[in-house]
């Protein structure tokens, strides 16, 4: 959750650059909503409960059986949070995607403890590749506000 809070801290600057943040989590929607409330996030946290998005980006992996056993021994049952029995997770990733759907920058690391600094994302948003077309700051849709996500 620390990464989401760090992104929340730079959200005003991101919006000034005409961008928005969308987080995608393998957790059930109810957990995503709870995280969003607890951290007072002003951006959407979407659920990828079957890891379909993670698979499409080549980020999904299955934990080796020894790690699954270790997780279970500590009482961490991913199926409770993710809603599926498989011990699969996405690699942490951050993408800068323009309005035409082109990935302008990507940061993916198999080591979940290594995350890009939000300042790096701000710098990527300041590049000419991002500013190929004029943009208006984006706001959360009324539908997402009504759903509480």
Language model features by range: what are they?
Residues 15-30, 43-50:
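Thiol-based oxidoreductase modules, predominantly thioredoxin-like and allied folds used
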Residues 48-114:
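Thiol/selenol-based redox catalytic cores and closely related redox-interacting motifs
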Residues 112-128:
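A short, polar/charged loop-to-alpha-helix boundary motif
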Residues 31-38, 56:
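Short alpha-helix adjacent to the SAM-binding motif of class I
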Residues 131-149:
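Cysteine/selenocysteine-centered motifs that mediate thiol-based redox chemistry or coordinate metal-sulfur cofactors
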Residues 2-5, 34, 116:
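Generic recognition of short, well-ordered alpha-helical segments
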Residues 1-9, 13:
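Conserved redox-active cysteine motifs that mediate thiol-disulfide chemistry
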